[in-house]
Amino acid sequence: MWKKHLVSLGYGYKLGVDLPGESRGFIPNAQFYNKIYGEGRWSANTIISIAIGQGEILATPLQIANLCATIANRGWFITPHVVKAIQDTIMPSQYLEKRIPTIDRQHFEDVAEGMRMAVTGGTCRLANLPGIEVCGKTGTAQNPHGKDHSAFIGFAP
């Protein structure tokens, strides 16, 4: 079920952004964990680190930005595309098609509120700009070979 939700959010497949070399990322499934740990030798406790971004899920920066846009839109996204110019007001339908994830819209409100609280009193306080409502999320990828990698993503609803 969770994989279905992740796919509906744009993870685990190529978004189709008109750029060469786009990666689909990776969403592990039971077969993957059976291969690594052995059938019946893993459980939710084995993979709980996925919940904090330290598991086996791989996502491209564009997939993460697209998820952030989905949260900002409160439950929809349009596949990102690269365009050189827009010359008239008639847009091809591929640039306008809204994708609706399988997650209830109210959950996006809750996540956006949490991202706002992260900016007003959490790890994103430096993004708290006077007169602009900003929602944000920080993250750190641990690097066993050197310095950790820190990231910030946000939007202004």
Which residues does each predicted region cover?
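Beta-lactam-recognizing serine transpeptidase/beta-lactamase-like catalytic domain environment
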Residues: 1-157
